[in-house]
Amino acid sequence: MIIGIYGYQDSGKTMLVEELVRALVKKGFKVSSIKHTPHDKTIDCEGKDTWRHWKAGSDPVVFSSETETTMIKHSRTSADDIACMLMSEFKPDVLIIEGFKEGSFPKVAIGHVTPRKGTVLTNPKLGDLVKYVENEVAVERVNDKLPGLDCGKCGLDCDGLARAIVAGKRVLKDCKELSDINVKILVGGRRISAGKFVSSIVDDTVRGMLSSLKGYGPGKVVEIRLEPKKPKAKPSIRRK
């Protein structure tokens, strides 16, 4: 899950993030975080090798040592885009975002600040925030098992059913579109809905085409990535 922490400077945002990360890691969650500053700052330094790479035209520039790897991109990137990249690449259970004003993720307000869209908690105690995050992670994990069709055949949308399952009021088998075939389709890093029929067609078609290829074996996880097609150049018209 993704959650944002926002508030004025010196309101205690970073301290809360520290405490939340420690509490979640202690409970076995994999946690990643993003820190945003409204100031025009850079961690790169003029004259350093990475700076020289950038001035020569390289962007982004990656610095790698025996203890860390840092990517420096000399342009602003939205919170949603950074979050999408981190969730796709590192797959944390929880991604904590400190400081961004925008973003489609749920947010926690700290201090005396005007509530932003998507605010779910205001000045919560650490224990209450941890419980909220734990519950949302559990709901997200159940949602990953549901087809995401929001067909309403169970009497709820998929998120509502997931929350009812986490609360112990419903069970996974209550989903009328649940398939034994686990097909997950992501477009731009976001999952799109696929019911029994679509899942069955995709699974049968892909595995059928791959069955004759060397390296394929029944029961193995198959991942296919479709890159955007480059637009074809229009043929030049010669005039007589």
Question: What are the residue ranges of the model-derived segments?
Answer:
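Walker A (P-loop) phosphate-binding motif
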Residues: 1-39, 146-149
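N-terminal phosphate/diphosphate-binding loop that engages ATP/GTP or pyrophosphate donors
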Residues: 21-74
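Glycine-rich phosphate-binding loop used to anchor ATP phosphates in small-molecule kinases
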Residues: 70-111
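Ser/Thr/Gly-rich flexible loops in soluble cytosolic domains mediating phosphotransfer, phosphorylation
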Residues: 113-145
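Local cysteine-cluster metal-coordination motifs and their immediate loop/turn environment
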Residues: 147-163, 176-177
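Non-heme iron-sulfur electron-transfer modules
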Residues: 165-180
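Short, hydrophobic/π-rich interface segment
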Residues: 188-212
